[in-house]
Amino acid sequence: MALWPLLLITLTIWILVRKWTLLRLGSSLPGPWAFPLLGNAQMVGKLRPEYIFLVFTELRDRFGATYRLRLGPQLWVFLHSAEETRQALHDPTLRKADTFMQLEPLIGNGLLISHGAHWTRQRRLLTPAFQPQLLRSFAPAIGGHVERLVGRLGATRGAFLEVTEPLFACLLDAIVDTSMGAQLDTQSVDHSPIIQAFHLSSKLLFKRMINPLLSSDWIFQRTQLWRDLDEQLQVIHSQMESVIEKRAKELLDMGEPAGRAHNLLDTLLLAKFEGQSLSRREIRDEINTFVFAGVDTTTAAMSFVLYALAKFPETQTRLRKELQDVALDETTDLDALNGLPYLEALIKEVLRLYTIVPTTGRQTTQSTEIGGRTYCAGVTLWINMYGLAHDKEYYPDPYAFKPERWLPEDGAVAPPAFSYIPFSGGPHVCIGRRYSLLLMKLLTARLVREFQMELSPEQAPLRLEAQMVLKAQQGINVSFLKQ
């Protein structure tokens, strides 16, 4: 037994020597009291999804715009100013935070978590799949899936229903159709296995990400949590691989015509880098990244759009008036849709108030300066996007829903750049941001044109929780009455 104190002392000395620069930097920053060795790991490990993002914002109010948390030997620094955010997102020496690497079982080494030369290559190869001209060609296909949703909602005859599931099915079908050319048809079945697999995978991965004890792959892969996750991943990967192989065979039979990529999957299958095609694993990683990130974030955003429309009926009236001269069918004029200021303002305000991705992180790889402070290698810099979007310095009355704050004709003053970054920013800005906005605008416009939406009188006051994305803890219940 006498050996344990000696081992503990040795471990402490080793950590102090190895992490001395980090410890010294951490001691120069304000933050909550930290235990020796453990730091604030116990506090972070106890944070529940429904308030974890609020705690990080409250700590800003207590300790200032830049504060630290310690998780054992790790140093987390939270940034809350628009200028520091701009610098961090443009710093070429930073890479994605190590925490995001825990998404690898689902999305592999896709754009969301890759960095360095691999990220640069993949970004360059994928960019053609998101050109405006190609996105425009998706409108009719998206419109078809939206019409199926309109039919489903109309069939409820004004009964209240929770909106997340029908939105998720519609968006999953639309995203897979336009990015892979495949028909999942999840809107026509109840309890689709792949939808359930996406939901469960997201919850299980988030449980791991907020538990410091599971940061080690070796430990995590020996838990029941991993076994549950692996079961869901088998469903997702088998479905995606089946679609990839089917399309690869079709292109092979066609002779792989150059310049004929019609979507993201075609772009990946036809891509060449230094004469070499992408591996099936690389293709699957990028497809899974796009589908998972796209459907989860856009579903959450659209849920809050419908909540806002139903809670504030005047927004429906104003938007419906703005839409009266816009065709919303296979001939939809996307220029006209993109030129509607109130639709744009409504979506911007939803993405600000209900910050779909509350935080993003970067890892220092060498000494770098941000906001006049020098950070050594090994620091995790967390950008609190929720805190930025709810900072009264940038947004007066920040917790109020005010689409007019984005309308110059209503006297709005533009907020500082990088105080509003729903799709992140800098070189790593979300490659699918225009696609996501296209989905949201088409869906919002069509539903407002078709229905009068009302919030259930039994809808509890909105309580948010952060999982992979921000969601309404108790769901959002809305009725859809035909105009």
From Swiss-Prot:
Q: How does it sit in the membrane?
A: Peripheral membrane protein
Enzyme Commission number(s) of this protein: 1.14.-.-
| InterPro entries in alphabetical order | Cyt_P450, Cyt_P450_CS, Cyt_P450_E_grp-I, Cyt_P450_sf, Cytochrome_P450_Monoox
**What keywords is this UniProt entry annotated with?**
Endoplasmic reticulum, Heme, Iron, Membrane, Metal-binding, Microsome, Monooxygenase, Oxidoreductase
A Pfam family recorded for this sequence? p450
Cellular component aspect of the GO annotation? endoplasmic reticulum membrane
Record localization: Endoplasmic reticulum membrane; Microsome membrane
Q: Which GO terms describe its molecular function?
A: heme binding; iron ion binding; monooxygenase activity; oxidoreductase activity, acting on paired donors, with incorporation or reduction of molecular oxygen
Kindly provide the name given to this protein in its UniProt entry. Probable cytochrome P450 311a1
User: Whose protein is this, by species?
Assistant: Drosophila melanogaster (Fruit fly)
